[in-house]
Amino acid sequence: GAWKTPVLFHSASRNPITFMTEDTFKTVQRRKDKGKHYLCGGTSFNVGVEAQYEQLELELPGVLPDMEKWVAKSREQLANAVYADVGEIEGHILVLFDAHVDKLLTVRAVRLTPSLEISTEEEDWSQYIHMPYAANQEIEPQKNNESDEEELVELL
């Protein structure tokens, strides 16, 4: 099903930014139908990125040709999420994080290849995690209500 997710836009680099846990990302990477996931639409903006050497050895499934319509739809949704007046989108950045109970353990920003491999463009931001912070807040999932005028975008 569809999820609502925040999409930020870094105007200096002209990149939309999305967020995901490390575990969810690993699951999406290995899906045979991953072309339906919004990440593939995001990575379609990442032209000319190269996978890290260790990522090449994973032999991840590629995006099947029959999934291209989903990739195009996700790409359009991401572009619309940051509004059309931003101009040309230069790429997509995924912020991956790992948390345990109430502690944020790691955070990194990555640029992905079209087959969802981590590219050579990666930054570890874990050094910026400082205590105290409140990570134990309970948040109720939002209902998908199309009449809401919120700053979230529904991505497939």
Regions found by a protein language model. Name each.
Residues 14, 40, 65, 120-123:
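Alpha-helical structural elements
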Residues 73-156:
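Glycine-rich, aromatic-bearing surface loops/beta-hairpins
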Residues 7, 57-58, 154:
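Intrinsically disordered, low-complexity segments enriched in glycine/proline and serine/threonine
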Residues 2-54:
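Aromatic- and glycine-enriched beta-alpha-beta binding-site module
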Residues 38-41, 45-79:
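Extended, compositionally biased interaction tracts of eukaryotic scaffold proteins
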